[in-house]
Amino acid sequence: MGSLGAILKHPDDFYPLLKLKIAARHAEKQIPSEPHWAFCYSMLHKVSRSFGLVIQQLGPQLRDAVCIFYLVLRALDTVEDDTSISTEVKVPIVMAFHCHIYDNDWHFSCGTKEYKVLMDEFHHVSNAFLDLGSSYKEAIEDITMRMGAGMAKFICKEVETIDDYDEYCHYVAGLVGLGLSKLFHASGAEDLATDSLSNSMGLFLQKTNIIRDYLEDINEIPKSRMFWPRQIWSKYVDKLEDLKYEENSAKAVQCLNDMVTDALVHAEDCLKYMSDLRGPAIFRFCAIPQIMAIGTLALCFNNTQVFRGVVKMRRGLTAKVIDQTKTMSDVYGAFFDFSCLLKSKVDNNDPNATKTLSRLEAIQKTCKESGTLSKRFCVFDFPLETIFYRV
């Protein structure tokens, strides 16, 4: 639950936080008895509690498939992220990862904390994967193969251009969107979404994470992880790491705003994808992370704290998003409000101000044209600014 100080400052957070805590305890009690499934669901809650909560609302077969899909890709991502592994060792592993998921004797020790446990005990994930229906297995294998090939390409290549950036994000996140769309379709609950819309769902989340995690990635030991494209950052500094130095704050914020503006191009596709969903559980599963993403972009925009430490939405607001996101009108409301906040933070002297405002106005137009913005809105306070969110 949130800290006492945060709750006293935002007393209306208390009830959503309490509901979230109760839901988390309930989810932990739902862990299956079979050892391999027990490992998978307990690991899911350790690597992503919020994801673990939302996934519990899916139907049993789809829930199992999405759980394993997530853990397989987290394991693959753990190999890619471990900067202590040499390229010569790493590339063959990620290239063959789609084969390893069929081998319940395979494991590879890497990563730290819960991710090391995931890798050391990967046979549990393999056993659970083998329990899935054939259509689910085929979708997971296909996406894992394509993602591994893409990761291998960028292990040996830096992100130079915006096209490189989009391609990298496609491999590590856009393909997740494609895979989830395949799993939703295989379950019989949804029509198969277009690759373009599915890709945008992944890119919006991934670009938000890359922006938010700048400092963590640049300070990675033994080697920095650099995902911001040179085509953007080279307009402001000579080296990507220069953005974290206080003397470069003005240029760093301009670069940050450029990155946020680039991410916003995917928002309208995300709204279209979500508006096409039929199942309430699948809808919430998709919508909650997207609202968190645009909220995080609103918090990061024009904020030097991105280059000084951790920037994230407060836990109470996260609890409200999870509790109150029920329908597409809630999504339109949240996207509209967060785009209003973003718009209020645009400095007309920023070199990308015109482009940023244009993208925000396009998002607002889509939300207004939905015809669902008639409700009033509550105001929530961030440590750094005021955030609006739908009641």
Curated annotation (Swiss-Prot):
Main location class: endoplasmic reticulum
Supply the enzyme class, top level: transferase
**Gene Ontology terms, MF aspect:** squalene synthase [NAD(P)H] activity
Which residues are in coiled coils? none
Query: Is-annotated flag, keyword Ribonucleoprotein?
Result: no
For this UniProt record, give its keywords in alphabetical order, as a comma-separated list.
Endoplasmic reticulum, Isoprene biosynthesis, Magnesium, Multifunctional enzyme, NADP, Transferase
Q: Where is the protein localized?
A: Endoplasmic reticulum
- Listed Pfam families: SQS_PSY (PF00494)
The superkingdom of the source organism is Eukaryota
One GO cellular component term, please give it. Answer: endoplasmic reticulum membrane
Q: What induces it?
A: Induced methyl jasmonate (MeJA) in adventitious roots. Induced by A.niger mycelium-derived elicitor, thus improving ginsenosides production in adventitious roots culture.
Q: Which reaction does it catalyse?
A: 2 (2E,6E)-farnesyl diphosphate + NADH + H(+) = squalene + 2 diphosphate + NAD(+); 2 (2E,6E)-farnesyl diphosphate + NADPH + H(+) = squalene + 2 diphosphate + NADP(+)
The record describes the protein's role as: Component of the triterpene saponins (e.g. ginsenosides or panaxosides) and phytosterols biosynthetic pathways. Catalyzes the biosynthesis of squalene.
NCBIfam families listed in its UniProt record: squal_synth
Return the similarity comment: Belongs to the phytoene/squalene synthase family.
Recorded protein name is Squalene synthase 8
What organism does the UniProt record list as the source?
Panax ginseng (Korean ginseng)
Q: Which lineage? A: Eukaryota, Viridiplantae, Streptophyta, Embryophyta, Tracheophyta
- Name of the gene encoding the protein in the UniProt record: SS8
